[in-house]
Amino acid sequence: MTAVLGMSARERERAAEAEALFERRATADLVDRLTDPSWLVRRAVVSALSRLGDEAIEPLIAVLTGDRRSETSIAAAVDALVSSLGHVEEAALRLARSPNTAISCDGAQILGRRRAVSALPELAHLAHSDNDNVALSALEAVGRIGGEPAVDLFIEAVESRSFFRAFPAIDLLGRTGDPRAVRPLAGLLRHPHYALEAVRALGRTGQPGAVPLLAELLTRPSDADVRIAAVSLVEIHDRYAGRFGATSAVPSALRTVDAASVSRRLAHAATDADSGERSAISRVLGWIGGAPAIHALVGLLDADPETARAAAASLASLERSAEPELLRALRTSGSERRLLLLPIVGRRSSATTDVIACLDDPNPNVRALACEALGRIGDASAVPVLFERLGDADARVSQGAVAAIQAMGGTEVERRAVELARTGGARARRPALRILAYFGSVTSLPLFLEGMADPDDRVRDVAANGLAAVDHPRALAALLEASHHGSSRTRATAVRALGQSDATEPVRARLLETLQDPDAWVRYYAVQALSRIGGLASAEPIAGLLHDAAGHVRVAAIDALARLRGDQSLEALHEALGSDDADVVRAALMGLGIVRSASSFPLLGPALHGADAATRLVAVSALAEFDVNEVVDELAKAAFDPSESVRAAAINLLGSRPGPDATRALVGLLGDEGSRDRVAAALTTYVAGRVEGIVAALDREGPETAAILVGVLARMRRPEAQLALEHAFALENVHARRAVAPALSPDITPRGRALLEQGAKSDPDEHVRRLCAAILRG
């Protein structure tokens, strides 16, 4: 039974009754409940009727052909027929042929929502009905089904200029994304009744061939025309980039416009625009470039957050040409605008002075971003002021200053850090020692040794990290001594640092001793350190911590055993799979993925199919590490797991797995509409055998899958994938050639134009010839 959150107790009771009626196959009683006042209950009734299949079809048809007094029951009956598991198409065709307008419209709607390809001829006939409502319903149904007949019908409707058919057909034609849509839509741009809708539809085509038409609108005196043209240009860019991965088509096409006049018109049109329109205008200004565009973009930084972010991104894309205006704005702006400007300031030293001025901004976020920007620039003249910020009251600023100083390096940095570590208070010594620890110079050793005697735990922590970075016997001796310190925090830091040292016998012996330390964090870091330098002899004492009182120690022990490997470690990992502690089980699964022993593979089954989603997720990740034939099948099954996280992981892991089996599995998963986008994204991961596997699939797949696979190859942006597209244009499968044609752009594949010209002249399929011709005209 469909479980719905938010039901009242009475609604849950009625939904349960509907499920009971389904179990009894009580079709008539369920049909009677289509008028239930609760949408949630009707949803349960619709679900039950759809699962009854063929036996519910005629009773539902009777609801639609009866007295039709209840709009509620009519809508519910349509939903039930749309989702029915039965053979609905013939009954829906009878409805569509009805002389009753409302019944005919319901029939067309059902056929469209079920994507009944076999009904296209009848729907095409209805699209020419004398009744505008019937014709519109048929057109919408054809739009849901798609295909070449849909494009032809929409073009015919648009060119009819019959308002009640042409107007809705404009949107439907644009949504086909077909290159042939551009010309008829362009013919409407000067028609007062259709122009604005045609501009929107041109955007929805996602066709670069429409860009010159829209670019002309950017200089019109009407601000509304300019705004809608900008929105449509952005939509073309996003759709084309999303489909084929090519991001230069629209910006390249806009290079021929008069940048100054277009920028002025866009800036003026932005004044009364809404947030989405201003955001689009910002992006178009970024593509156009030039001083007027940059000036307008700086002004848009003060708009709503969405627009400001878009303007900042456009300024960042203009890089060096925008720098003078950016720096001028940085000098004169308040904190809010500086938050947008600082991340996009370039790496040239000419920006140093203006960025340094931001270190005095009252907003700590601005000061932190200024530190980050100075680190990117790398101008050593900023070192003195960055050292002043080490004592900033806000920790983010202090840490940002440390990171910037570390990025610069040099003798001046080391000199200042040494001086501060010697003379500063505890608050100043910590960042100074952290800087010195980053460079790990042996000349800093006395300061680190002195720091280990500091009464402040935090200073000792930083000093211990510095000792770990210095390759000197005195540093190692100090760390060994610190592992006996009275402070558990200092012992833990020292033990962690010992894990970064050479695997000498004194170090290994001391780490083994600290496995028995009374503090859990000391034991934890000891286990981690031994996993790196302990060797197989450490396996047994580490295995003794599998039942430690502290959960994080148990998990660390599992991870360490996996890294140490060996028969004893593997046996301990197998044993840990039976633990009552879910964290230990997950750690053991991760460990088995590290070891990758074929003998462990069958043991993953219970975790892969268990009740706990988090454990299944870890099991799927471990599974992918094994090199056995069954891995691909198990990952494909996990792609239908109830947990969205597990499904996503399984698909992504298939995407990164080389070989034809993984590619075939992913292509098979494209049939699942819910995960289709994620599967397509996974297929774009370039691994051995991926391109070859996609081409093999293109030779046999239908139109929908072929279009997706062509987009995958185009988005790879690799020479092998480009050659594969060109090869696919010669495949016998006409669906592959139809899908490839829109991708044959010089932006995507070098020989694109030549192949389009060849296809327009000699392809055996008329639709391919027309597609190629339309693209070439664009």
State each model region's role.
Residues 3-24, 32, 40-54, 62, ...:
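Structural detector for internal amphipathic alpha-helices that build alpha-solenoid repeat scaffolds
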Residues 29:
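Short acidic active-site motifs
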Residues 37, 68-69, 99, 130, ...:
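Structural signature of alpha-solenoid helical repeat scaffolds
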